[in-house]
């Protein structure tokens, strides 16, 4: 179906998932047969910067796409090493090569594209993998997950009230499915403890 790549790779943290991530993944789905999401910070203890596990974040992503989209999306946890560390680059190459072999078993020369915002300083890693094409996406309405976490934490983690300012804000930046999942997560004891910890930082 006229795809420009066999596999599009998007490195993200999705703490939590929002419309910006979704727009990038939709663009990737339009251009590649398979979309491989590498979820960073995957084996970290919960913290104000990483409140959600990779399983919880994968559930947010899955809940935001149709069955057809999900059938072409692979989500793989990525260990955190400092971004400029050669070990991090190796981890990504190994994960991408392994998953590409699995997704395209008969393909001796699969085309791989890295997806990101080249204008965004956090995406300088696009330049770290010159052997892959790049699919450049605009930063969707300037949304970032730091602002979402900040809003939730500033509300003391309470996102139960549909009329509250924090829920109105969340509706403008993420899917209803993610908000429902977040509601379940924000009352978990270990997530409540992260919200408490954040108050003292």
Regions found by a protein language model. Give the residues of each.
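Nucleotidyltransferase catalytic core that binds NTPs
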Residues: 1-200
